Amino acid sequence: MKKLLIFGSIIVALFAALAFVTSYQQKEAVKDNPYHKKELDPATIEQLDDPNYQNLILPDELEKKLKNKETVTVYFYSPTCPHCQKTTPIVVPLAKKMGIDLKLFNLLEFKDGWDKYHIEGTPTLVHYENGKEVKRIDGYHEEAVFRDWFSSIQHRHQ
């Protein structure tokens, strides 16, 4: 009985230590994060160092751009969305190559964006001009489709 009690105590101590280490790692990962939030979803934490997820736009910043009637192209995505995971490596490098400043809006972290920007599913790319939506594309597509979509918004400015 004494051995069982000692063994049980060791197991409890190991789980407590594991919980502490995991909690500490998550706190360190979100420290000084670009989302300016105290807690982030683990899927977002995984993307913090990914070069495809660096050109973020926060809700206040997007709202300010739209209120100021600026032109902005936004990629609404969720880190847990399988279609976004296939789309991001296509659209982010393509936009950069085409000279489009594609802003990324994380709907997992900022859930109000679903209703506010009328997003029905992810991924969704929306182009705004003078603070108003003028063009949108939803879902996963091949690179050629996104290239044509980006070209169409470029031609609006020529």
Question: Where in the sequence are the language-model features?
Answer:
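Non-catalytic, surface beta->alpha helical segment in thiol-disulfide oxidoreductase systems
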Residues: 4, 126-158
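A short beta-strand-turn-helix
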Residues: 51-70
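Short active-site neighborhood of thiol/selenol oxidoreductases, capturing the structured segment around
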Residues: 65-79, 91
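Typically the conserved alpha-helix immediately C-terminal to a functionally engaged Cys/Sec
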Residues: 83-98
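Structural micro-motif
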Residues: 117-126
